[in-house]
Design a protein with these regions (language model features):
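Hydrophobic/aromatic-rich, well-ordered segments within soluble, folded domains that form packed cores
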Residues: 194-199, 297, 301, 382-383, ...
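Short amphipathic alpha-helical segments embedded in low-complexity Lys/Glu-rich regions
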Residues: 32-33, 62, 85, 115, ...
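Alpha-helical repeat/alpha-solenoid scaffolds of the HEAT/ARM/MIF4G superfamily
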Residues: 142, 155-352, 362
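Alpha-helical interaction elements in eukaryotic regulators
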Residues: 5, 9-12, 21, 25, ...
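Eukaryotic extended interaction platforms
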Residues: 1-176, 283-287, 308
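Contiguous, well-ordered alpha-helical segments that form the cores/surfaces of helical PPI scaffolds
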Residues: 254-257, 290, 306-314, 324-328, ...
């Protein structure tokens, strides 16, 4: 069984788009870039399949099924030989693709103002400026109470927190999802976060949900997929080496292996610009009646993918509920961080927003780093593509993700990335190489998210 892209269809689309040149510039760009990128991912997966002589999928022998079932809750103790497996791609590979995005219509002069953009992203998408961001994130203002701010001048922190907890309990009692979303814009009390997030995401963990999770688990037990080894490898390379998350290794395997089998995830491709990859029964290449999506959820994991799940393990200890929360977070938010699109929360827009904020409000720093070959996006991209998971301390990361849920937007990731550069600007102005700049920004674990965001948006920038 081999993966194959439907090149005939892609070519037809490209030809149609060319004839409509000018009518949908961003769509044209997205389709061409996506087609090329998806083809590259499939080629990487196919090459691994061929080199290792491993099928994309196989049914496990009964003995192997029993063994996996017995060790389901302690898969972290398993040490399979993964030395020959490699991630299909890493964030830096994806950044190279985004850097090469071009729109010839704009390069011919349609939008001369964009020529002043000296960053790595050369796609003229509309992104918000500071006044618009202030308006969008008004609840982060200096005069608004926030969890994660220790020295509010308006209300003593303990008084705000006590009242905030009381309001949060009322929101939970009323089971009002919209009220919960508004509430978490000021941060979630630790004791209420799990329930509030579940309310916002409409996760109730009913018996049928638990049964569905068990069915996915059964599918994992019965069938072995090539992507299972990619998941194992990713967990071993990332979460297993993280001081915060290594204890959740078993949870990560369970959730991610089940996720790969979940065909309901395919539904998000109706609003995700990407195309789920297909495999064909051997000898039936290109015959649609013999095609299936591979993996079944249509999502090929990349290096760092498991870090989307890891922070959630602090909040949810019931595997089926943890699974549902992650799946909903993925189809609402995380897929946008590794998909090429012009959506305001898509990774291309986030990169452009980050670069625009730095170039506009910290021009000296931006130009200095650019001149020494340390384009800021080369450093910040990995933070944004993982939603800062694995970079911030967990308590700070959860405060950040509160706001992602509250504002139903990932734009705050770009704002925080710019705020980090602003915070370390003095040290960064002294560096003379990319390696030195990376060293200055190597450890974000001591940073306090909310003060950084407030200062950047509402205090130092006008």
């Amino acid at each position: 069984m081999m993966l194959e892209q439907d090149t005939g269809l892609s070519l037809a689309i490209a030809q149609i788009v060319q004839r409509l040149k000018g009518s949908s510039l961003h769509s044209q760009l997205e389709r061409q870039a996506r087609g090329s990128w998806e083809k590259r991912i499939l080629k990487s997966l196919n090459s691994m399949c061929t080199e290792l002589s491993i099928p994309l999928a196989r049914k496990r022998p009964i003995g192997e099924q029993k063994e996996l079932l017995n060790k389901w809750n302690e898969m972290g103790t398993d040490e399979p030989d993964l030395s020959l497996f490699r991630p299909v791609y890493a964030p830096k590979d994806f950044l190279e693709v985004l850097m090469n995005l071009r729109n010839p219509n704009y390069e011919n002069g349609d939008q001369p103002s964009f020529r002043n953009h000296l960053g790595l992203i050369q796609v003229p998408l509309k992104v918000k400026d500071i006044p618009e961001l202030k308006d969008s994130f008004s609840e982060l203002g200096l005069n608004t109470g926030q969890l994660g701010i220790d020295d509010s001048t308006q209300v003593p922190p303990e008084l705000f927190e006590n009242e905030h907890v009381r309001v949060g309990q009322t929101v939970l009692t009323e089971q009002d999802s919209a009220a919960a979303q508004q509430y978490v814009r000021q941060g979630c009390p630790t004791a209420l976060r799990a329930e509030l997030w579940a309310l916002i995401l409409n996760i109730s963990n009913q018996p049928e949900d638990i049964l569905y999770y068990e069915q996915l688990k059964s599918n994992v037990i019965q069938h072995d997929l090539l992507v299972d080894s990619l998941i194992y490898k990713d967990v071993k390379l990332t979460a297993s080496n993280d001081d915060y998350y290594f204890v959740f290794e078993d949870y990560l395997y369970q959730v991610l292996l089940c996720f790969s089998r979940d065909t309901s995830v395919l539904e998000h491709f109706s609003y995700n610009s990407a195309t789920p990859p297909k495999s064909y029964i051997r000898g039936k290449l290109g015959m649609e009646e013999y095609a299936v999506f591979y993996p079944p959820n249509g999502v090929i994991p990349f290096h760092g993918f498991s870090m989307y799940v890891a922070p959630l393990c602090f909040l949810y200890h019931e595997p089926s509920k943890l699974y549902q929360i992650f799946r909903e977070m993925y189809v609402r938010f995380f897929f946008r961080l590794h998909s090429i699109s012009s959506h305001p929360s898509g990774i291309v827009s986030l990169c452009l927003l980050f670069e625009t904020l730095l170039q506009t409000h910290l021009p000296q720093l931006f130009y200095h780093l650019r001149e020494i070959g340390a384009q800021p996006l080369r450093i910040s991209f990995k933070w944004m593509v993982r939603a800062f998971s694995g970079y911030l301390a967990t308590d700070q990361l959860l405060l950040l993700w509160d706001r992602i849920l509250g504002y139903n937007s990932l734009e705050i990731l770009a704002v925080l990335a710019a705020a980090v550069f602003a915070f370390r600007a003095v040290n960064l102005m002294e560096v003379t190489s990319l390696a030195a700049a990376e060293a200055v920004l190597a450890d974000l674990s001591t940073l306090k998210v909310m003060p950084l965001l407030q200062i950047f948006l509402f205090a130092t920038v006008t």
